[in-house]
Amino acid sequence: MFRSITQRVIRNNCYKQSTKSITSSTSFINNSLSYTTTSNENDIKDKNEEHDHRAKGKGRELLLSFDKSGLAQFPKQVFKNRKYPITDFEKYLQDITKVRGPMSIDTFIKEVLTNPKYGYYMNKDVFGKGGDFITAPEVSQLFGEMIGIWCVATWEAMGKPKKLQIVEMGPGRGTLMKDILRSTKVFKEFYDSISVHLVEASPANKKTQKQNLLYFKDKAINFDHKTIGETPNGIKVTWVGKLEEVPTDIPTLFLAQEFFDALPIHVFRFSREKNDWCEVLVDEDITEHGEYYLRFVQSKGPTLMTTAVKHLLPEFGLDGYQVELGLAGLAISQQIANRIDKSGGAALIIDYGYDKIVKSSLQAIRDHEFVDILDKPGTADLSVWVDFQTIRKTVKLLKNKSTAIGPVDQGIFLKEMGIEHRLAQIGRKLDSNEKFEELVMGYKKLVDPKEMGTNYKVITICDKNITPIGFSTSKTYDDEDLMI
């Protein structure tokens, strides 16, 4: 399900700066303007000399002459093997590297996914059959209904607080929240206690979410950098751009379904020559044989980031050993844990990933197919496989009232939440075999180990005094050694 990062090293710097003393002379003759720039050398007819004649009307001529022999020459064969003409976004990314030098993969992912003008998520609906990929809520209503059951059961385990926030991070098209609100309205006491916050950066996604969730689709109001609306059943929905804008003094259930996989990462590679960790970066590619306009390179030595996270990296010296570290995801995990410690609640993180540190999983998907990461950036989704082990250990490092439990396979979690019972319940009410077969197909895709059942995993962050719902099969981890 993933493709390794293409490793391209060695940068050819063709932008060496050299200057040569240039003098200029100007002369005005008979209403004719002639501007001439020459070198100190007498022979301005050298083969490196260029002339640009531009008519400015009868009797007017602009003459430019300059010697380029002292300037660095751009390779004549550059870009000749490229698969397509360079895009405006690629020019923009190249300009960044020219000014600042190679960028971290963290910065590259941020630009590709959330750049206001070119970002993949910012200007179109990318979910569902008409988009580039399908997420679990789009597969079947059963998924959202099981998450709704988890919300109600966890609220009860918390002691049924009178006020409860449900916060979804990266809510996609709003399908998951729509199914949760539809399926839980039979639990009146729970329903009367809830409000919803959606953490969304994409204007295009926010528009789709409003259409799916609100009673008055175009009547949501903007207040204090937030957008506020109401569902047909009277549930208040607030859109914010980041988690920090969500109130911290109310018990909260946090939902992150395929959210962490889209967060930026840093990639580190051990160099035996340097006997230290280096960082994998993205640079412009101006070589003759490169397929794309960007390429991956390795830093010449430790960077500021490798120094900052060195205590998190393994201490062994296999040359070329590579590690992905999602610092943004770890920071959000700790932020959620601190909120739960302060005000109570729980979090459910669902994503594809491993219960171990990840080496090389960055991937790009366009039109439901994997493509090269550097192929027309901004037109394909970038994602990584989530490192659940590091999330769990990072939360436990806080040593407060919160803890992390899991992960468990998605298929096992959904079965423990009662998906099979719900499948049978709905199946008895369907009036055609086609509808029943469609329902069963969705169920199988969610729980089958060959589909999403095993690759997708679930982890919870919760108060230590709460017995987490859906995690009875979770392993007991010896995390005394919290070294990642």
UniProtKB/Swiss-Prot annotation:
Transit peptide start and end: 1-12
Top enzyme category: transferase
GO molecular function, one term: protein-arginine omega-N symmetric methyltransferase activity
Alphabetic keyword roster: Methyltransferase, Mitochondrion, Transferase, Transit peptide
Documented EC number(s): 2.1.1.320
GO cellular component: mitochondrion
Catalysed reactions, semicolon-separated: L-arginyl-[protein] + 2 S-adenosyl-L-methionine = N(omega),N(omega)'-dimethyl-L-arginyl-[protein] + 2 S-adenosyl-L-homocysteine + 2 H(+)
Main location, first listed in the record: mitochondrion
Disruption outcome: Cells show pleiotropic defects. Cell size, growth rate, phagocytosis and macropinocytosis are affected. During development, cells show an enhanced tendency to remain at the slug stage, and spore viability are compromised.
GO biological-process terms attached to the record: ATP metabolic process; culmination involved in sorocarp development; glutamate metabolic process; glycogen metabolic process; methylation; mitochondrial respiratory chain complex I assembly; negative regulation of autophagy; phagocytosis
InterPro entries, per database record: NDUFAF7, NDUFAF7_sf, SAM-dependent_MTases_sf
Pfam families: Methyltransf_28 (PF02636)
Places the protein is found: Mitochondrion
Source organism, top-level taxon: Eukaryota
Similarity remark: Belongs to the NDUFAF7 family.
Subunit structure: Homodimer. Interacts with ndufs2.
Function: Involved in the assembly or stability of mitochondrial NADH:ubiquinone oxidoreductase complex (complex I). Acts as an arginine methyltransferase and probably acts by mediating arginine methylation of ndufs2.
Designated name of the protein: Protein arginine methyltransferase NDUFAF7 homolog, mitochondrial
Organism of provenance: Dictyostelium discoideum
Gene name, Swiss-Prot/TrEMBL: midA
